[in-house]
Amino acid sequence: MLQRIGHRYLILIALAAVVAVLPLIFPSSYYFRVASLVWVSAFAAIGLNVLMGQAGQVSLGHAGFFGIGAYAVAIGPAHFGVPPWAAIIIGCALSCVLAYLVGRPILKLKGHYLAIATLGFGVLVALVITTESRWTGGPDGMPVAKLVLFGWRVSGSDTWYWITGGLLVLGTWLALNLNDTPTGRAFRALHDSEVAARVAGIDVARFKLQAFVIAAAYASIAGSALALMNGFINPDQAGFLHSVEMVTMVVLGGLGSVVGSIVGAAVLITLPQILTVFQEYEHLLLGFIIIVSMIFMRDGIVPTLSRLLAKRTQA
């Protein structure tokens, strides 16, 4: 137990150190912007990892919750005069309620049936956002009001770097603590075998729903943060391709690994920036690198590297 607690705080200290040191190495607004995008994406991926990596449930429509959070901070101030900080809370609450209502029937499904059902939810959210142009701006998107906290207008890539970095550290801390709670252990039991979990007295339906709601909350908050940071939002953030990106981050980094979700997000966000020098071959190389990574690191980047490091240490 003490070893797990020490490992948990070691991860948090290492993450906080990375967030603190990066501006000293890359002190420019461009790198602040890219890093902020990594932090937001990693935050969303950590939530999805709770659902997929810990509870063993598939979601191909999770960008729907991301879009709800994003559009909440756009629609709230623009149409109802709600302060952006309150719109974040409203968007998160709405996402959690929807996750509960949608999750009750669809989480009775398994495997590819569940994947298709969650995909349908994501498509429905994206469709509503695109067609309800009076509220959302339609396919063209809409501007997002600036976040104001205690009379301070939040702006600038460096400011958002620290806000999103702090958000990621907080989200990581919550996810790591969840692992050692009865809820976290129930999630892992579900992942291993629903039948065995049910025999052990675990309320399978309730814990599936809890994982779905937690993942929705993470995605919604991440969506709100990205919308406020960009000052603009469009339906792509709630689309299927974004859902696939989120799943790829979790799987690439390592299912069940909180650190893996962060690494997966960092790789998937920064690689396209690095590969831009190859111009028209950029997407080809990106796909090739991901395929090779999954062939040689089937469990994901972090679990594979951890296993190799453990073998070397034992030797």
For every predicted segment, state its role.
Residues M1-A315:
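Transmembrane alpha-helices and adjacent helix-loop boundaries
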